[in-house]
Amino acid sequence: MSVLKLFDLSGKVALVTGASSGIGQAIAAAYAEAGAAVVMVARREAELKTAVQKIQAAGGKAACIRCDLAERKSLYACAEQAPEFFGAPDIVVNAAGINIRKPMLELTEEDWDRTLRINLDASFFLPQRLAPAMIAKGWGRIVNIASLQSVRAFGNSGPYGASKGGVMQLTRAQAEAWSKHGICANAIAPGFFATPLTAPVVNDPARWQAMAAKTFIGRNGALDDLRGTAIFLASHASDYITGQTIFVDGGFSAG
C-alpha cells in the first residue's frame, strides 16, 4: 500500500459524536476531507445541520443525527439509525463531552451522573452497538477523546477528570476485546484548545496564558493540530497500534 493510501479514508464511514462544534466538528471535517462519509451526532440540531452543510459545501459527504447521549434510549436509536445514510460505520469517534465546573462539595448527583453518562457511558455503549458490524467486516476503528485531565487533576473539574480517566482505561479494554477482530481502539488526549467546553479558561486571558506557558511549545492548541492524529488513528496507517492514548498537548503532560 502506498504511503498516501495509508492515510486515505475513501470508502470509509465515520460516526462522530459531539460534532456540532469544537473537537468533534473539526475531526468530522478532517475525515470528510480525507474521503470518508461522515455521520455527525450531537444534541444541538441547528448547529449540527450547519456543520453538515459546511462539509457538503466543500464537496464532502455528511449526514446528521440529533441525539442526547445522556439518554440511553436516544443513544441506542442513534446506533440503529447510523447505517441508514452511508452503511455501517467503520470508524467511531467519541468526542461528545461536558464539564460541569463546580467545587467538589457543591456537585449534585445529577452533575455527576450526567457527566459520566455523556463522557464515559456513551463511549462504551455506542461502540458496543456498532462493533458487531465492524467485526463482520474484519476492520474498524474506535477513536475516543480522552483529556489531559485523564492523568492530571484540575480544580472544579472532578467529574470530568474522573470520566476522562475512565475513557483512557476503557480504550484499553476495547482494544483487548476487539483488536483480534481487526478493530483498533485508541484515544486522543488533547491539552488546552479553544472550544465551547474550555470557554471559561479561554475567556480568562491570565489563565489561558498560564496554560500555554506550561507547554513545551509555548502555546495552546489549535483545532488543526488534532487533524493529523485523528486521521492517523482512523486509517490503515495505525493498523498495528491499539490500546494507546496519544497526548496532543504541546508537551504539557510531559513536563
Which residue ranges define each predicted feature?
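Conserved glycine-rich Rossmann-like NAD(P)H-binding loop of the short-chain dehydrogenase/reductase
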Residues: 36-50
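Conserved glycine-rich cofactor-binding loop
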Residues: 13, 20-21
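Active-site helix of classical SDR
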Residues: 127, 163, 171
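C-terminal substrate-recognition "lid" of short-chain dehydrogenase/reductases
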Residues: 124, 139, 219-248, 253
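Residue(s) in the substrate-gating loop at a strand-loop-helix junction
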Residues: 147
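Alpha-helical segment proximal to the catalytic Tyr-Lys
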Residues: 132, 176-180, 239
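Substrate-binding pocket helix/loop in short-chain dehydrogenase/reductase
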Residues: 103-104, 108-116, 142, 207, ...
